[in-house]
């Protein structure tokens, strides 16, 4: 009964958010137009979703994955940007945070711990990974590329005790913008 009530509240909240957003958009005048010349534009695109499974343990896979990542530090980025004015030096300082893969870890979310609140015992971590220098190379051509940078990777243990890694292929995410300067650099990523 409580679960059914919770779902009804969630559905109501989603509906209310849609009404509020529609009302706000009806009264807001945008100075610039979205692609297509309209103040609001919907589009659809195909995303290549990758699912990998291995019999290696969750701990082995997460450790190996994390070993390939550097650690993003917002203070280092901010100091590099605010520094001497030498853009190449600033990019080098930011790039130095990357790990062997060229990526850095922005953060994690332990969804396994969250699922304990639902009475489930799972191992699942979502990783937020990227590289601000890579993001700069894309967003300078189309700011909308920042919707997908940094990227998300989910590593979890399934019911058969296999470890799974899932992510959306970056070239398909960034390819939607139709700009080869954005998509071409992502084809070597995973």
State the predicted function of each range.
Residues 1-3, 41:
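N-terminal hydrophobic targeting signals that begin at the initiator methionine
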Residues 3-15:
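N-terminal Sec-pathway targeting helices
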Residues 13-23:
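Hydrophobic membrane-insertion alpha-helices, especially the h-region
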Residues 27-190:
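Feature detects long, helix-prone N-terminal segments enriched in hydrophobes
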């Amino acid at each position: 009964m409580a679960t059914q009530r919770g779902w009804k509240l969630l559905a109501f909240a989603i509906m209310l958010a849609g009404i509020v957003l529609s009302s706000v958009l009806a009264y807001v005048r945008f100075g610039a137009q979205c692609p297509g010349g309209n103040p609001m534009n919907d589009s659809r695109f195909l995303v290549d979703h990758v699912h990998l499974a291995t019999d290696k343990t969750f701990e082995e896979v997460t450790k190996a994955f994390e070993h390939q990542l550097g650690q993003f530090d917002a203070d280092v980025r901010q100091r590099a940007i605010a520094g001497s004015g030498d853009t190449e030096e600033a990019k080098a300082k930011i790039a130095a945070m990357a790990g062997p893969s060229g990526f850095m870890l922005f953060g994690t979310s332990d969804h396994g711990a969250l699922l304990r609140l639902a009475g489930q015992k799972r191992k699942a971590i979502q990783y937020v990974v990227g590289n601000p220098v890579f993001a700069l190379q894309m967003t300078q051509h189309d700011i909308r590329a920042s919707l997908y940078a940094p990227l998300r990777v989910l590593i979890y243990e399934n019911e058969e005790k296999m470890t799974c890694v899932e992510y959306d292929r970056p070239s398909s995410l960034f390819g939607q913008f139709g700009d080869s300067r954005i998509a071409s650099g992502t084809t070597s990523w995973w």
